């Protein structure tokens, strides 16, 4: 028996991927059975962070040391992550959600459909308002795009109106949200998006 929904979380270093996973676990774990797989190149830093924050019981969080390029471990050769997901699904059957957090990567990052059912891509305004129009699979093809840290827009000179216009053009109708995960802005909308994708049955 597999989990109902495997959700990939990708994005550049520092965009807010771990903050998103932390927030979703804390917000959803009373109503859903959840587990997490994190990716780091040489450490298990993100997994340890989530464990120390007590977002879930420790056994539900697995850290994968990819030892190389982050996108290889979620796309070309996702065996390490797939095995971690299967371990969690076997141990905590049934699971509603398994979140797979990629290591920080560039705009070319994308998940193998063998690993996840849907993907969330996280960028943030501190990288500049030009990021959405640069495109890439995360911007254009992810199931949900988040533009995080909008509270920093004025401080870094990012124009949210430009980001909105460019994002709507690049996404072609696919969903996206402005978020400020540190304050909780956008979290309810993300949860509703995830809940809307839970299948009735998945073998």
UniProtKB/Swiss-Prot annotation:
SUPFAM superfamilies: P-loop containing nucleoside triphosphate hydrolases
Binding site for GTP: 11-18
InterPro entries: CobW/HypB/UreG_nucleotide-bd, P-loop_NTPase, UreG
GO molecular function, one term: GTP binding
Compartment(s) of residence: Cytoplasm
CDD domains: UreG
Any GO BP: urea catabolic process
One Pfam family this sequence matches: cobW
Listed transmembrane segments: none
Alphabetical keyword list: Chaperone, Cytoplasm, GTP-binding, Nickel insertion, Nucleotide-binding
GO cellular component: cytoplasm
Main location: cytoplasm
GTP-binding is among the record's keywords: yes
Entry function: Facilitates the functional incorporation of the urease nickel metallocenter. This process requires GTP hydrolysis, probably effectuated by UreG.
PANTHER family linked to this entry: UREASE ACCESSORY PROTEIN G
Subunit structure: Homodimer. UreD, UreF and UreG form a complex that acts as a GTP-hydrolysis-dependent molecular chaperone, activating the urease apoprotein by helping to assemble the nickel containing metallocenter of UreC. The UreE protein probably delivers the nickel.
Family under the similarity heading: Belongs to the SIMIBI class G3E GTPase family. UreG subfamily.
Name the record gives this protein: Urease accessory protein UreG
Species: Prochlorococcus marinus (strain AS9601)
High-level lineage: Bacteria, Bacillati, Cyanobacteriota, Cyanophyceae, Synechococcales
């Amino acid at each position: 028996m597999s989990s109902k929904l495997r959700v990939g979380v990708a994005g550049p270093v520092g965009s807010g991927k771990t903050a998103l996973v932390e927030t979703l676990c804390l917000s959803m774990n009373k109503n859903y059975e959840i587990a997490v797989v994190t990716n780091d190149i040489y450490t298990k830093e993100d997994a340890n962070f989530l464990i120390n924050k007590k977002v879930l019981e420790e056994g539900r969080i697995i850290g994968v040391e990819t030892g190389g390029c982050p996108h290889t471990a979620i796309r070309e050769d996702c065996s390490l992550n797939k095995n971690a997901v299967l371990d969690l699904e076997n141990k905590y059957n049934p699971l509603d959600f398994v979140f797979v957090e990629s290591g920080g990567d560039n705009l070319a990052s994308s998940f193998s459909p063998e690993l996840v059912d849907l993907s969330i891509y996280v960028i943030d305004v501190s990288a500049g308002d030009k990021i959405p129009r640069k495109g890439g699979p995360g911007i254009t093809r992810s199931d949900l795009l988040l533009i995080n840290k909008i509270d920093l827009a004025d401080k870094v000179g990012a124009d949210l109106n430009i980001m909105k216009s460019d994002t709507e053009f690049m996404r072609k109708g696919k969903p996206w949200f402005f978020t400020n995960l540190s304050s909780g802005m956008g979290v309810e909308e993300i949860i509703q998006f995830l809940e809307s994708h839970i299948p009735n049955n998945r073998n």
